């Protein structure tokens, strides 16, 4: 097989692996790859998989027969744009400010959150009220859209003044408490609160 034909077959295999994972949630077996791309020899497929791995397009786990993961470089080779999270403005972690709902940019979706794709957004945090939870001024929080939360979860909530804030959520007897993670700051006590989502991730781009 010529170099050009070999490269074409490898891309065909890579595409089949990607499509299979997207459709059913786990990779194909080597025999399934053989049938899909018209190869009769499993050793030939193993050779193509090894070359795809050397090129940085695929990650294999030799101890698990179906452990095939396409890398970001592999997806780029297939012309697949990475999934992205919309960045929808700024939320304060000190005193609440008016929420900004316009999408300002997009952020690559972390692989471990792909199952929540379409339900996530990102907000930049200003203020120090959540520092004991590890959320610092300038951090970006990844938020899964949901309208309810359990006590103790960190949420993005709208106050009754139509302002947004990041706090730890508590529902108490006759009110809601949005609790900062900073001993110098008081909680926000509300009769009504609207939860925009739960904080499920954090991105910091200024690590020293």
Swiss-Prot record:
GO terms for biological process: DNA repair; DNA replication; negative regulation of DNA-templated transcription; proteolysis; SOS response. Residues 30-50 bind DNA. It comes from the Bacteria. Keywords: Autocatalytic cleavage, DNA damage, DNA repair, DNA replication, DNA-binding, Hydrolase, Repressor, SOS response, Transcription, Transcription regulation. The record marks 93-94 as: Cleavage. Homodimer. Represses a number of genes involved in the response to DNA damage (SOS response), including recA and lexA. In the presence of single-stranded DNA, RecA interacts with LexA causing an autocatalytic cleavage which disrupts the DNA-binding part of LexA, leading to derepression of the SOS regulon and eventually DNA repair. Belongs to the peptidase S24 family. NCBIfam families: lexA. This is LexA repressor. The lineage of its organism: Bacteria, Bacillati, Bacillota, Bacilli, Lactobacillales. The gene is lexA.
């Amino acid at each position: 097989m010529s170099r050009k034909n070999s490269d074409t077959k490898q891309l065909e295999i890579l595409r089949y692996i990607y499509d299979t994972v997207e459709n059913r949630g786990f990779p194909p077996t080597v025999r399934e790859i053989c049938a899909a791309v018209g190869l009769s020899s499993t050793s030939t497929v193993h050779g193509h998989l090894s070359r795809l791995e050397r090129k940085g397009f695929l990650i294999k786990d030799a101890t698990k027969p179906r452990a095939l993961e396409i890398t970001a470089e592999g997806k780029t080779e297939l012309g697949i744009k990475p999934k992205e999270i919309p960045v929808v403005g700024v939320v304060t972690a000190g005193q609440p400010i008016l929420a900004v709902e316009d999408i300002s940019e997009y952020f690559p979706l972390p692989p471990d959150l792909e199952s929540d794709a379409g339900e996530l957004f990102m907000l930049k945090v200003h203020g120090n009220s959540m520092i004991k939870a590890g959320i610092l001024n300038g951090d970006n929080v990844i938020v899964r859209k949901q309208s309810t939360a359990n006590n103790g979860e960190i949420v993005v909530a709208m106050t009754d003044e139509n302002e947004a804030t990041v706090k730890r959520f508590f529902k108490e007897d006759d009110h809601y408490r949005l609790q900062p993670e900073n001993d110098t700051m008081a909680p926000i006590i509300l009769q009504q609160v609207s939860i925009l989502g739960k904080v499920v991730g954090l991105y910091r781009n200024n690590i020293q």
